[in-house]
A protein has these predicted regions:
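Conserved, structured core segments of small domains
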Residues: 1-114
Length: 114
């Protein structure tokens, strides 16, 4: 079963630019542990870090699909990345997600088949 894991943290980008090499190494170690846990029970389909929300553009609803600078919603909690994993069930996805940095909120959402 495929799941999308969205990783969010309050003021994520400001924090990331301030942390030192040791803190970044801890984050990457957590990613490694997560990757190993998923590989033991399933597959990582994709995983990406996302650029700063200031680099986003959004197409708004409506017939002319206006393009605006920035993310679709303003929020202090920013999505910093995502994983798409194929695991046996939600419990396995939760177990793997617990290995990601504990300062982040992780939304786990099943992917639809069609």
């Amino acid at each position: 079963m495929r799941f999308v894991l969205l990783m969010a943290e309050t003021d994520h980008y400001e924090k990331w630019h301030r942390v030192g090499d040791a803190e970044r190494a801890e984050v990457f170690a957590a990613f490694g542990a997560f990757s190993e846990a998923v590989a033991a029970r399933g597959t990582i389909v994709a995983g990406e870090g996302l650029a700063d929300p200031g680099e986003a553009v959004t197409l708004r609803p409506g017939p002319d699909r206006a393009v605006t600078a920035g993310p679709y919603t303003e929020s202090v909690e920013q999505v910093g990345g995502l994983w798409i994993v194929d695991l046996p069930d939600l419990d396995a996805a939760i177990e793997a997600a617990r290995l990601l940095p504990e300062s982040w909120s992780i939304e786990i959402r099943p992917a639809t088949d069609g």
